[in-house]
Amino acid sequence: GHDLIVSQANNPGVLIKQIKRTQSAEDLKLLRDRLTDIIQSSIHKNIPLFHIYNIASEINLALIKRSVELAILDLGSPPARFAWLCIGSQGRKEQLLLTDQDSILVFEDVVPDKYRDVKDYFLKLAKRSTSNLEKIGYSLCPNGHLGSNTLWCKSLSDWTNQYNSWMNTPGKNSNDLSSIFFDYEMAFGESKIEEAIENVIYKNAKSNTLFFDFLGNDALRNNAPLSFFKKFIIEEEGPNKDKFDIKTRALLPLIDSARLFALSYGIKGVNNTYSRFKQLAIADPRNAEIYINCAEAFLTLSKFRTIEGLKNEDSGQFINLNELNKLDKERLKNALAPMRELEELIKDKFQLTQFS
């Protein structure tokens, strides 16, 4: 009987039902801790990572949605329709470890004399929601990419202007133009608003050389993972000395490249790195092999990072190579191989010559 109770406790469907009924952020935290158990036991059982991503993403979304609902219960019903979008890793459904919360809030356009009151309400809502999320364990984003930041809580028209200026004059706005704003998933609200944002992005992306130049250079800016002699390039100093930065040197280049190509091929509705590469293999069959290798490499690398993060209760960004056996080191090295070809493909497709 005991095993059954434990497996019920860690059943994703049951967990989501409980989240929907929860009355406080403190209780949500207990349910978030169970998600970590689910992730750990799934990895232990060797369940495919892509499947684990989907389960975790559903549970994370339910937690975020409930955090916003609890804030609404406190504040009273919203004066206008809105959408709460997760951006970054949760927007890509790639959040397994507790990382920062990244979000934006988009509310529908209202008549000018109502604007201030409406915006006031949504700023309050965003503050409450993010503080609920903080209680659950999602730390506030260090870059301030949060709906509760005045910059990231605005009307649909203001967001439209924001994306227009980011995408049409990327150089001018490079300080706050973060590519994570192109990875989004709605946690709460009006799907029409999310569609409107998506349409703005894809309209601006059409044959926008300047924008792809910017994103392309951005994707190529990360440091190589292996030296010329195929040795891992490790941290030379600081608290992570001698460790391998799997996030910056391996995962980010794949995440950035998948986004870059997906936007340039107009692939809509797919914000996940693995799925983006699979879709690209269909959109650009001539280079299908490269994309499929990258999709698989992404999962392999992500699994290394997740295991490291669960072991150390951190973000898993730095891999201690001395703790890997020979076989794992080989697997890690092989997963870095497709990046070379991908880099050539980017330079070729976007004719990148100058590196900003």
Predicted regions and their residues:
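Generic beta-strand/beta-sheet core signal
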Residues: 85-87, 104-108, 141-143
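Conserved catalytic core of two-metal-ion nucleotidyltransferases
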Residues: 31-43, 53-66, 74-81, 115-181, ...
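Glycine- and acidic
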Residues: 42-53, 106-116, 237-243, 285-286, ...
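Short beta->alpha transition motifs characteristic of CBS
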Residues: 1-10
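Catalytic metal-binding acidic patch
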Residues: 92-120
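… and, occasionally, acidic/histidine-rich disordered N-termini of signaling adaptors
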Residues: 76-90, 98
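Conserved nucleotidyltransferase catalytic core and NTase-mimicking acidic/glycine-rich helix/loop elements
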Residues: 80-82, 192-193, 198-356
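Long, non-coiled-coil amphipathic alpha-helical linker/lever segments
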Residues: 15-49, 325-344
